[in-house]
Design a protein with these regions (language model features):
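Positively charged n-region of N-terminal signal peptides that target proteins for export
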Residues: 1-4, 146
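Sec/Tat signal peptide C-region and signal peptidase I cleavage site
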Residues: 15-19
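Subset of outer-membrane beta-barrel
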Residues: 20-217
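Sec-dependent N-terminal signal peptides
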Residues: 4-13
Length: 217
């Protein structure tokens, strides 16, 4: 029994070592930051909630079930306020139902990392840079039945985070991605003390090529 436990322990250590060699660094993580108060207050839960103007980030398929013909939303989110005071996420959303079953939507997210001072030496004149990223989205959702809808979204991403240094360029990186989403909403049901609905959803997000900051490859 001790030999088996020792062998299993060795296998776990080997797997952990290999995992450390394959560290994956996710690019443009600002896409995962909640841009609306409701979803942020619900632990980033927005895929299967009721429709609102911010559905573009979480599940654009929800727009087909909107009771409003169109909607507009604007938000500003300070980020890491306990550490710095100039990092923020701004977001603009708009959707328009073209009929009872289909809807177009678009959004713009802008993430600013504030001002960063670069110095060659302690007494040198600082070089102030303002790294930032943005994403522009466009989606279309369509009801496939009275209770289920799907959506596709395209996204252009531009990231200007690379800080210039001697002998290296600091060009912005850009890429594109797309989402495939679905949403189900039941009929209103009478429960013991209230009327409610069942909702479910999925969203495969940011499918596409890797973003590359190295312009030499």
């Amino acid at each position: 029994m001790k030999k088996i436990a020792a062998i299993l322990l060795c296998l776990v250590v080997v797997q952990l070592s290999k995992a450390q060699e394959r560290v994956i660094t996710t690019g443009v993580p600002f896409l995962l930051v909640a841009g609306d108060a409701r979803s942020a207050g619900m632990a980033d839960n927005g895929v299967a909630t009721s429709t609102d103007a911010y559905s573009q980030q979480w599940n654009p398929a929800k727009y087909s079930f909107s009771l409003d013909k169109q909607g507009f939303a604007l938000s500003y989110t300070p980020y890491l306020v306990e550490l710095v005071n100039d990092i923020s996420l701004g977001q603009v959303n708009y959707f328009n139902k073209i009929n009872d079953r289909g809807a177009f939507a678009s959004s713009l997210r802008f993430f600013s990392l504030g001002e960063i001072e670069l110095r060659e030496s302690f007494d040198a004149q600082p070089n102030v840079v303002k790294p930032a990223e943005f994403a522009l989205d466009l989606s279309y959702s369509q009801k496939l039945s009275e209770r289920f809808s799907m959506a596709v979204a395209g996204r252009y991403i531009r990231s200007n985070l690379r800080i210039p240094s001697e002998g290296q360029s600091a060009a912005a990186a850009s890429s594109f991605a797309f989402d495939v989403a679905g949403f189900y909403q039941s009929e209103e049901t009478a429960f013991t003390d209230f009327d409610g609905r069942w909702r479910a959803g999925f969203n495969f997000q940011n499918l596409g090529p890797k973003i590359n900051y190295d312009q030499s490859t």
